[in-house]
Structures are given as C-alpha cells and as structure tokens.
C-alpha cells in the first residue's frame, strides 16, 4: 500500500511550500547537504544499536535498518521484520516502518514502500525528514509555539545576548557560523572563546562549531562548512536537523544537570544544617565561657584611693562596653538567629528539630546574659558613685585653691594702697575721686566677704571629709582670714581721713563756685556793655536814635548796682585767700570753675567807665543828622503825594476819552492833543521831585513813611502816561485813516465802538476770544457752535490776532469790520482781471504781462509767478491763479 505525507496535518512543523509531490528535482547543493545531514543524523541514533549506514538511499532499501532506526529513536518495539531477500520481503519491512510512522499521527503523502525499495533519493530523503520532524522536532515547544517556530524561538533566545547573531530562519541566518558557536558558548562557554570569532570568517566559525560539537557534545558532523558557505541559501531541512541535535544534546545535559543539582541541593542542605549545629554549639560554648569569666570582674567592688585609679577602672569598663561587649551582643543575636534559622530549615526539609547539648539552650544563654547585665549594672553604679565621691573631694580641693588664689591675687598690694597719704595734696575733685574710688573698693571688699566665707566653708568641709592635705589647707585659710581683718581696719582709717579733707576743700570749693557763678555773668555783662558802647550803630529814623538814647540812659542808671556786684565778687576771692592762709591748705592757687581773675574784672570795669561819655557824644551827633533826614522825607512826601494821584487821574481820563464816543474822530484827536500839551507842561514838577529824591539818596534814606510813592513809581507812571497819550492819539489817527480808506461812516464807527465797549467789561481796551465772538454775534454774524462755526471763528481769529496773543484790539476789530462791510478788492477779482489780460486763458505769458502792465509791476509778477503745469500749457506759461491767492495771504507767494 502507498503512504502519503500530508504537510497540512503535522502540527505545522512543515511549511506548505515544502510539498514532496512537486515534480521538480531538489537543488543539487541542497540534496548534497540533506544526504550528509540526514545520514549523520541516522548514524547518531543507529550507533546506539551498534550499526550505521553509508548510503542513505541504498541502506534503507530492505527496511531492516529503517525499522531499527525507528525502534532506537522511539524506544518502542516494531513488528518482527521479514528476513528474506526478495523484493516482497523488503516492501513488507518498509511498510511496517511506514505503518509505525503513520501510527504516530503522521499522514504520509506520495511516499510508498516501492520508491524506498527502489532507492528513490527524493522519497528516501523525504521519509527521513518526516522521521526527523516527528521524533526530533515535533516535541520541541517553547511558549505554545509549533515545532519549527519553537525551535527557532529557542535559538533566538539562546543567542540573543551575542553580538552579530540574528537568527530569523533556518537557512541564511546560520551561514556565518556565529549562530552555532553562540549556542555552544551559551551552554558550554569553556569550549569556545567567542570573543575571538569574526563575522567575516564563516569557514573558521562553522568548522570550529562542528568540530567542538562532534568532539565534546557527541553531535556528529552533519554539514560541511564549505557547502554552507558556497550555497546562497543553505538547505533549511539540513540546518533544522543539525540544530535539533544541538537542542536535544543541551536538553539532555540540562536534565542530567538538574538531577545532579537536586542531589547536591539535598546534600548541601544537610551539610549546611550540620554546620549550623556545629557553629551554634561552638558559639554557645564560647559565649557562656566569656560570660563566666566576665561576671567576677564586674562583681569586684574594691575601692581605689585616687581619682586616677578610679578613672582607669571606668576607662576599662568603657572599653568593655565599647569594644568587648558589642561583639558578644552580636554573637548572642547571631546565635538566636542561627538557632531559629536552623530550626526553620530543618522543619522545611522534613528533618527532626535540633536539640542543643545540655546547658546551651537559648534560654540558658539568655539567663546567663541576664546575670551578666545585672552585674554590669551594679558595677557601673558603684563606679559612678566612687567617682562622684573622689570627684567631690578633688573638686572641693581645686575650688579651695582657685578661690584662695583669686583672693590672694586680689589682696596683693591692697594694704600698701590703703596706707597712702595721697589725699594730703589732692584737690577737691581729686578727693572726691579718691572717695569714689574708696567707696568702690569698699563695695569690692564687701563682695569679697562671700569669697572669704566660702574659702573657710570649703576648708571646713575638706576637714570633715578627711582630705589628705588638710594641714596645708588650714594654714592657708588662717592666713587669708588674718589678712582680711587687717584690710578692714585700714579701710576704715582711710575713709575717715578722706572725709576730713573733703569737708575742708568743699568749703573752699563752694566759695570758688560762688565766685565763678557771679564773676561769669558780671564779666559777660561788662563785655556786652563794652561791645554795646563801642558798637557803630546805623539808624534811619528819628525814632530809632531816640530809642538808642533812651537805652543808653537806662544803662547808665545801672552802673552803681554793677559796681556793688563787682565789690562783692572781689570779697569772695579775698575770703578764699584767708582760709588758705589760715589752714595751710596746699592749693594750686587757681579757681577750677573760672579763669576770670579779680585783676581782669577791675580792668574791664575801668574800661566801661571810659566808654560811657564817648557813647553820649556819638548819640547826640546822630540825633541831629536824623532830624535833617526827617525834614527831607516830609518835603519829598508832600510833592509825591500830589504828583502820584495826578498821574493816575490823567491815565484814567485818557482811557475814558479813548472809549467814549463824543463828537467825531477829529474832535477826539484835537481833544487828545490839547491833553498831551497840558501833560508836557507838568514836566517841571517832575524835575523838582527828582532833585529832592537825589538829596534823599545822598543822605542814605531808604524808606519814607510820609508817602507810598517812590521815585521809581513816579518815573514809571510818568513814562506810561506819555506813552499812553501818544498811543491813544495814534489809534485815533489810524481809525481816521481806516474810516477814510474804507468809506466807513461816522455812524458805523460809533456802532463799532459801542459794541466793542459793551463787551470790554474790564475796560482793558481789548477783547478776549469769547468776548470777541459775542461781539460779532451782536453785530449780526452767524457763528454757530458746531464744527463749521468753530472753523469759521478760528479763521476770523487768525485775521484779527495773527500773532496769537489771545486778545483783539479795537484797531484790529475796526480793520476786520471795515473789510467785511466795505467794497474791497479780493483774490477772485484779481484773478478775473488777469484772465482778461490773458485772453480768457488759464495761464498768462511773459509777453502779455510786459505788454499790459507797467515795466516794474510786470517784472514783479514775472519774478513771483510759478510756472503753469496744466495740460493746455505752452512754453513759458505762468500760473496767475496761485499768484493772485498768494497776494491775499490765501497761499504762499
């Protein structure tokens, strides 16, 4: 019967394109690779049965070795083979083998026993590949993948850590040999030095991998390196077969290793437990022995007599706590940890619990450790108490020495200081300083009383505590007490001497102070009097000189009392001299409170007496001069009080004449000129006032209470009066010119003046913008409050106030009103005239201007007219329109 291999029914460990029914022959290179690989693979299993094949298509023809191969790789017994040599026997044996393969779930397609018996290479290789797939590859599964994919995934994972290895398939990914080397190195790194391999040397890499696999891994050499390198795409089946051998080789080794590891693990656990038991016993013994040796040392309470010895014991105890005990604490802790760990491991490994030898249980060790800590606590308390006791003695002794040394240092030189006689030659301030210093010393002495008492108390306590050096302490304490009593007596004696001297010097000091208090103001009074008597006074009025004279008389009246004060001050000085002579006081001879001597007082007093008559004479002379100045003031004031109002009156009359509208302009002009003549005739009075003013200046008179008018005011008023009358006459003359030039009637002029005066409410002769606007409206001008009205008013203001002064004069008002009411020339009229001269053209030529106008006016126009640029322009054409508007200020000329 024929068996066919179905590639779709083999758990996807064959790709669909690998169809053995195709008629095409195998690639010769692939066939060669498959022959070698499959032959080597078969021999790797047949050698277990003591045989092998040489020619794959010949040696399987009788079916005997084929059945043997299946028994070896499956581990099962097949049906008994036929031993005959006939074709039918061979076909029967091959069918038995094929039936066994089919019984394993492999559907064979197009593979029949006859082709195998006939030595068909293609069918024989296909059959072997089917066997390899079923028994070498099908059972490979990684993360639920198919056989081929599982084998590929296994290769990828094993080679992932290696550089230059990227396994993606079972053909070209293996050509450089690094994939085979990586698999070997991953499982047996000692067999290959992977770091020395080169990607560009595939032959060496492949031969290295094949040789090592054959020699050390018992994997036969199934491929030739030259065939793989020389083939563009190595045969996939050959590569898969070879790689599966690596998989099974390493898988088997891993199982053996796992078994060995399991045994080693069990033994290691047992050995570790035994070691832990031994360690526990030894550690427990050592720790208990250390506790046994340490407790007697801690229970030793023999006291020491010196602080140094006790401190050494304390240092030894600190070393014990710092150096010796911590390791033992760690050992005790480790002992308990080891015991618990050991019991846990024994329990987890189903071993019996560990029972330490007698007396070495954890509880026994804890009890011993508790005894150690109890002894340690008592020892530490005893040490500290002993140290405190010795420390107290040392502290008291040191405290006594320190206080005694401080006291002795303080008393050094104090007795000699208290016996000094420095107060006999001291001044009062020095005596007071000595008393203050002595009081400070007494305070210091009182403060040291506590220290002396403390020294005695410490000495007493040292005696009570049987201090070894008590005799020297007592001797030193007695010396300090004796010296203290002597200091007290000397202190009292010095205080009494200082107080006696102070009382005597205070009497003298009080006299000195009284002298200084009275001499200083008297001296100041004399100095002030001398300054006043010699002062060069400057007065401007008779009242001022009278005030100075009165003050001087009052000063002279105080001179008798001043002389009495002088004599009293000199009496104080004489009393001091008497005391010094009587009690033989050692004085410096100078008053500490003042530098003013009696001689100085007498000298200044004599000088004051000499200055008084000189002052009398100076005041009399100044009084006469001020009387003359007063006469000049009255004379100037009388004239100024007449001229000033006269100028003001004339100014008001001129303003009224310019505003009022009596008669014609010619009448007003005549009136003003007569007025001007009367003003000019007043000039001699102004000149006379100037003369009086000159006399006042020469007399240095700067103010005049008899008038509010100064010469400067008169001059300014006079000049303003002359200017105003001249300006007013000029305005009237201009109004006459305007009236005659514009043809304004007298009635119109009067109307304009009436309107202007009505809105000139402050009589300043000018109108502000708002006043001017109201005036225009009253005259019939339509100026609205909208934008157009504002623009029109702005245009009018630019005419009447071209300099933007913010006011409109009556002359500007008349000019504007005359322009608005009279028939005057305009720019349009001039343009119309030029157009007539130009023959109704928009431009005019030079020849036409020279023909129609006088020569000078023609040249004037030619020089100022701009060229005409219109479309109808001819050469030399001039623009008379822009020229006409420029004449009236409506554009730039």
Curated annotation (Swiss-Prot):
Among PROSITE patterns, the record links this protein to: ACTININ_1, ACTININ_2, CH, EF_HAND_1, EF_HAND_2
Top-level taxon of origin? Eukaryota
In Gene Ontology terms, what is one molecular function of this protein? alpha-actinin binding
Q: Where does the protein principally reside?
A: cytoplasm
UniProt keywords, alphabetically: Actin-binding, Calcium, Cell junction, Cell membrane, Cell projection, Cytoplasm, Cytoskeleton, Membrane, Metal-binding, Phosphoprotein, Repeat
Q: Where are the Spectrin repeats?
A: 275-385, 395-500, 510-621, 631-734
Region Actin-binding, annotated ranges: 1-248
Residues binding Ca(2+), per UniProt: 760, 762, 764, 766, 771
Report the function annotation for this chain: F-actin cross-linking protein is thought to anchor actin to a variety of intracellular structures. This is a bundling protein.
Q: Which PANTHER family match?
A: SPECTRIN/FILAMIN RELATED CYTOSKELETAL PROTEIN
Which family does the UniProt entry place this protein in?
Belongs to the alpha-actinin family.
Q: Which protein are we looking at?
A: Alpha-actinin-1
Q: Which organism is it from?
A: Gallus gallus
């Amino acid at each position: 019967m024929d068996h066919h291999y179905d590639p779709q029914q083999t758990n996807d460990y064959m790709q669909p394109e690998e169809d053995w029914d195709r008629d095409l022959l195998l690639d010769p290179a692939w066939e060669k690779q498959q022959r070698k690989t499959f032959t080597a693979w078969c021999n790797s299993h047949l050698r277990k049965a003591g045989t092998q094949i040489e020619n794959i298509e010949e040696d399987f023809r009788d079916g005997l070795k084929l059945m043997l191969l299946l028994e070896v790789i499956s581990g099962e017994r097949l049906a008994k083979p036929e031993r005959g040599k006939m074709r039918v026997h061979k076909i029967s044996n091959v069918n038995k083998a094929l039936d066994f393969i089919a019984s394993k779930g492999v559907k064979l397609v197009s593979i029949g026993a006859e082709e195998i018996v006939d030595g068909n290479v293609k069918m024989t290789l296909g059959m072997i590949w089917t066997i390899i797939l079923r028994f070498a590859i099908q059972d490979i599964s990684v993360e639920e993948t198919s056989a081929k994919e599982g084998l590929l995934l296994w290769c990828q994972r094993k080679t992932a850590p290696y550089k230059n290895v990227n396994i993606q398939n079972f053909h070209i990914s293996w050509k450089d040999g690094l994939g085979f080397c990586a698999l070997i190195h991953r499982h047996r790194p000692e067999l290959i030095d992977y770091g020395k391999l080169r990607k560009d040397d595939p032959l060496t890499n492949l031969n290295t991998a094949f040789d090592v696999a054959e020699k050390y891994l018992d994997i036969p050499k199934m491929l030739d390196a030259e065939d793989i390198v020389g083939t563009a795409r190595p045969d996939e089946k050959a590569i898969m077969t070879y790689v599966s051998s690596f998989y099974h080789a390493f898988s088997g080794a891993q199982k053996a290793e796992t078994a060995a590891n399991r045994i080693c693990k069990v033994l290691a656990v047992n050995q570790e437990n035994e070691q832990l038991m031994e360690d526990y016993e030894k550690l427990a013994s050592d720790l208990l022995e250390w506790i046994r040796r340490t407790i007697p040392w801690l229970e030793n309470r023999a006291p020491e007599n010196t602080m140094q010895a006790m401190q050494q014991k304390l240092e030894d105890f600190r070393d014990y706590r710092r150096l010796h005990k911590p390791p033992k604490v760690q050992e005790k802790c480790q002992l308990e940890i080891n015991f618990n760990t050991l019991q846990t491991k024994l329990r987890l490994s189903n071993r019996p619990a560990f029972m330490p030898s007698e007396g070495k249980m954890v509880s026994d060790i804890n009890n011993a450790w508790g005894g150690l800590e109890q002894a340690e606590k008592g020892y530490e308390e005893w040490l500290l108490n002993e140290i405190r006791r010795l420390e107290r003695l040392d502290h008291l002794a040191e405290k006594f020495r320190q206080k005694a040394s401080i006291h002795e240092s303080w008393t050094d030189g104090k007795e000699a200081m208290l016996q000094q006689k420095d107060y006999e030659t001291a001044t009062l301030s020095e005596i007071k300083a000595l008393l203050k210093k002595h009081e400070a010393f007494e305070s210091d002495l009182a403060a040291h009383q506590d220290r002396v008492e403390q020294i005695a108390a410490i000495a007493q306590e040292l005696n009570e505590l049987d201090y070894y050096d008590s005799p020297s302490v007592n001797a030193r304490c007695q010396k300090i007490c004796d010296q203290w009593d002597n200091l007290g007596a000397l202190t009292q004696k010095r205080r009494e001497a200082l107080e006696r001297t102070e009382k005597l010097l205070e009497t003298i000091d009080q006299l000195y102070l009284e002298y200084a208090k009275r001499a200083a103001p008297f001296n100041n009074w004399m100095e002030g009097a001398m300054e006043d008597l010699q002062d060069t006074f400057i007065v401007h009025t008779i009242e001022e000189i009278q005030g100075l004279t009165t003050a001087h008389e009052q000063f002279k009246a105080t001179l008798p009392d001043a002389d009495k004060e002088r004599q009293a001050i000199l009496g104080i000085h004489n009393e001091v001299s008497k005391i010094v002579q009587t009690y033989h006081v050692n004085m410096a001879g100078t008053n500490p409170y003042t530098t003013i001597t009696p001689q100085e007082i007498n000298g200044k007093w004599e000088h004051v007496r000499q200055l008084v008559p000189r002052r009398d004479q100076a005041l009399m002379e100044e009084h006469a001069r001020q009387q003359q100045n007063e006469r000049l003031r009255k004379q100037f004031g009388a004239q100024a009080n007449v001229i000033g109002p006269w100028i003001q009156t004339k100014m008001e009359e001129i303003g009224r004449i310019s505003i009022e509208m009596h008669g014609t302009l010619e009448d007003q002009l005549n009136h003003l000129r007569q007025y001007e003549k009367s003003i000019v005739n007043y000039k001699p009075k102004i000149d006379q006032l100037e003369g009086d003013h000159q006399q006042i200046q020469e007399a240095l008179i700067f103010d005049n209470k008899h008038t509010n008018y100064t010469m400067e005011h008169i001059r300014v008023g006079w000049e303003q009066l002359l200017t105003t009358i001249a300006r007013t006459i000029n305005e009237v003359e201009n109004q006459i010119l305007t009236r005659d030039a514009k043809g304004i009637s007298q009635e119109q002029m009067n109307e304009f003046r009436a309107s202007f005066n009505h809105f000139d409410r402050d009589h300043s002769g000018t109108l502000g913008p708002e006043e001017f606007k109201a005036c225009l409206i009253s005259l019939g001008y339509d100026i609205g409050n909208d934008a157009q009205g504002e623009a029109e008013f702005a245009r009018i203001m630019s005419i009447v106030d071209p300099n933007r002064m913010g006011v409109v004069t009556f002359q500007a008002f008349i000019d504007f009103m005359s322009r608005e009411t009279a028939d005057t020339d305009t720019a349009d009229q001039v343009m119309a005239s030029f157009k007539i001269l130009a023959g109704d053209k928009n431009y005019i030529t030079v020849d036409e201007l020279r023909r129609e106008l006088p020569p000078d006016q023609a040249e004037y126009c030619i020089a100022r007219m701009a060229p005409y640029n219109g479309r109808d322009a001819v050469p030399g054409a001039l623009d008379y329109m822009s020229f006409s508007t420029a004449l009236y200020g409506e554009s730039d000329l």
